[in-house]
Amino acid sequence: MVASPGWLTQAMAGFGDQTDVLCGRIESPHRRVPAAHERDAGAPDPEILVTNCFCRRAVLDALDGFDERFCAGWREDIELHFRLLKMQANIARSPLATVIHPEPPARWGASLFELHKISFDALLYKKHPELYRQKIRRLPCWEEYAIVAAIVIAVLGLVAGNEVVAVIGCGAWLVLTAMLCIRRLDGAAHSAVHIADILVTSALIPPAAVFWRVIGAIRYRVRFA
């Protein structure tokens, strides 16, 4: 990341007497149509990014450090924001205090390689359940659980030799996966490579996402879905 000219001056100018925390702006020099993996994380843009955030020493002392268990993209930012909200910190913004953040090209199948971060959502939910439901995900991702249930039904039907049950499970999986694929394509880049990426990863994401949610729930001992 590269600070823009006047970054510190603009930040200090926006830091009023009653301000506890000031957030600058992070800008990408070549904004592009988002790839699917950038929208699959299940979270909105963090309202606070520690990479461009100014905080009074007294507030940092009151926070008593950071939870180092959050070691995956944006979760540490969200957790800091939630803690500041709970302590009723006065948060201001300075859009002129800008940091430039170049975006590297995403590799093929990036969505799958990002899914392990979902396990940290369980910890975020355990520490801040109400804020998590208000600001991150209001309801569990039932779509993914329904797709996994369809896979289980299809497999059980095949194992039991029940063609009707197997066909019902396969049909439900196909319809639900197609709906997921269409939703992920909406507003995303439409290159041939990216479309192929979405077709493949849409079939693999639901079981992988459910797996990592279960791992997170077990690791952090919380009922989380």
How does the language model describe each region?
Residues G6-Q10, E79-R83, F120-L123, A209, ...:
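Alpha-helical elements of Rossmann-like donor-binding domains used by nucleotide-donor carbohydrate transfer enzymes
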Residues M1-A36, N90, P95-T98, P102:
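Conserved donor NDP-sugar-binding/catalytic core segment of glycosyltransferases
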Residues D67, A72, E76-R133:
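Catalytic donor/gating beta->alpha subdomain of glycosyltransferases that bind UDP-sugars
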Residues A146-Y220:
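Membrane-embedded multi-pass helical conduit in multi-pass membrane proteins
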Residues E103, R107-A166, H190-A196:
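Basic/Trp-rich segment in TM-proximal cytosolic loops or flexible interdomain/linker regions
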Residues M1-S4, S28, C55, E76, ...:
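Hydrophobic/aromatic residue at the end of a short beta strand that borders the catalytic acidic motif
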Residues E38-P44:
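Short, P/G- and charge-enriched loop/turn segments at secondary-structure junctions
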Residues L49-D64:
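Conserved nucleotide-sugar donor-binding
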